[in-house]
Amino acid sequence: MNCPDCGNGRTRVIDTGASSDGASVRRRRECQRCSFRFTTYERPEWKSLQVKKRDGTIESFDQQKLRTGIERAVEKRGVAETTVTALVDDIESELQDREARIVSSSLIGELVSENLRTLDKVAYIRFVSVYKAFSEPQEFLKELDAVLGAELDDFEASNSSQ
């Protein structure tokens, strides 16, 4: 395991335990060169999951690619790293639970969209603007209207029942 601070390949494990969700092993490590401490998570390797992209090509599922897309959407939104990790794990688990070993990139995009919409509306708009390849300001307005309209409906429903 390479140190994320200095890149040295010699680290030692100083603490090991189960993660909070029980699906992975949490290891606290220390770099032998610079003494930087960091945490890693080990998880079992899933059955090989393939992603069919829009252009028809098929590639291996890349959890880091999923994480990067979500991190870009939630950047500077105050969303905790543990929340991002849980979201990535939930989406990957949902994909692994499916019978098919090949999933479409659009399915992954929809799962991310659904989760971000409930987590953070701004992150959701950021994500769908890239995922749906918005090219006109009206597309942003249409999506904002849908998000704000749903919030307004929820607000009116909660006030009418009082």
From Swiss-Prot:
InterPro entries: ATP-cone_dom (IPR005144), NrdR-like_N (IPR055173), RNR_NrdR-like (IPR003796). One of its GO terms (biological process) is negative regulation of DNA-templated transcription. Residues 49-139 form the ATP-cone domain. Disulfide bonds: none annotated. Residues 1-21 are annotated as: Disordered. Its cofactor is Zn(2+). A zinc finger (unnamed) spans 3-34. Keywords: ATP-binding, DNA-binding, Metal-binding, Nucleotide-binding, Plasmid, Repressor, Transcription, Transcription regulation, Zinc, Zinc-finger. PROSITE patterns: ATP_CONE. It comes from the Archaea. The keyword Glycosyltransferase does not apply. Binds 1 zinc ion. The keyword Ubl conjugation does not apply. Coiled coil: none annotated. One of its GO terms (molecular function) is zinc ion binding. Belongs to the NrdR family. Negatively regulates transcription of bacterial ribonucleotide reductase nrd genes and operons by binding to NrdR-boxes. PANTHER family: TRANSCRIPTIONAL REPRESSOR NRDR. This is Transcriptional repressor NrdR. It comes from Natronomonas pharaonis (strain ATCC 35678 / DSM 2160 / CIP 103997 / JCM 8858 / NBRC 14720 / NCIMB 2260 / Gabara) (Halobacterium pharaonis). The gene is nrdR.
